[in-house]
UniProtKB/Swiss-Prot annotation:
Belongs to the gamma-glutamylcyclotransferase family. One of its GO terms (biological process) is modified amino acid catabolic process. One of its GO terms (molecular function) is gamma-glutamylaminecyclotransferase activity. The active site is at E107. One of its GO terms (cellular component) is cytosol. The gene is GGACT. It comes from the Eukaryota. Pfam families: GGACT. The keyword Lyase applies. Its EC number is 4.3.2.8. Monomer. Substrate binds at Y32, G33, T34, L35. Contributes to degradation of proteins cross-linked by transglutaminases by degrading the cross-link between a lysine and a glutamic acid residue. Catalyzes the formation of 5-oxo-L-proline from L-gamma-glutamyl-L-epsilon-lysine. Inactive with L-gamma-glutamyl-alpha-amino acid substrates such as L-gamma-glutamyl-L-alpha-cysteine and L-gamma-glutamyl-L-alpha-alanine. The lineage of its organism: Eukaryota, Metazoa, Chordata, Craniata, Vertebrata. This is Gamma-glutamylaminecyclotransferase.
Length: 168
């Protein structure tokens, strides 16, 4: 059974599960892990049954964050510790409310990830862009000491193979 339904966040900090917004607007979402192009879960962004997701470009966080691979399934996690780690590379998608709700459920928000906001530099665009992102705020203390990545690849030289959901 899925956790509580997350809705559009309206606070400056992007507190998870804010108020609903049915305005039909598109929300920018920064993805840094298995949802990126060429990664194991990218297909869910392409599936129109979940809503609309339009690729806007490559980007990187303006602040450094610790991006680690953690847990028994080698899941990439962006720890919500701005100022530590590296500027993280990823992609920005503009998503409709239906896709955002799907992503909240897919990312087990708010139990496993929390939908927050951060600023990114989008390639070819001047000025920062505020995006939603799925970060991890609650985790075992040893995760802070794992190696920090700046650009996740499930087949990367780190040797930690992601275990897809369908194999768990």
């Amino acid at each position: 059974m899925p956790g509580p339904e997350c809705k559009w966040s309206t606070t400056e900090t992007g507190a998870p599960c804010g108020t609903d917004d049915s305005s039909g607007r598109l929300a920018p979402v920064f993805v840094y892990g298995t949802l990126k192009t060429g990664q194991p879960n990218h297909r869910v962004l392409l599936d129109g049954a979940h809503g609309r997701a339009a690729f806007r470009g490559r980007a990187h966080t303006l602040e450094p964050y610790p991006l680690v691979i953690a847990g028994e399934h080698n899941i990439p996690r962006l720890l919500n510790l701005p100022g530590r780690g590296h500027r993280v590379f990823g992609e920005v998608y503009e998503v409709d409310e239906r896709m955002l709700r799907f992503l909240d459920e897919f990312e087990s928000c708010p139990d496993m990830y929390q939908r927050t906001r951060l600023h990114v530099a989008l390639e070819g665009v001047r000025g920062p862009l505020e995006c939603f992102v799925y970060t991890t705020a609650t985790y075992p203390p040893e995760w802070v000491h794992l190696p920090y990545l700046d650009d996740y690849d499930s087949q990367g030289k780190h040797g930690l193979r992601y275990n897809p959901r369908e194999n768990r």
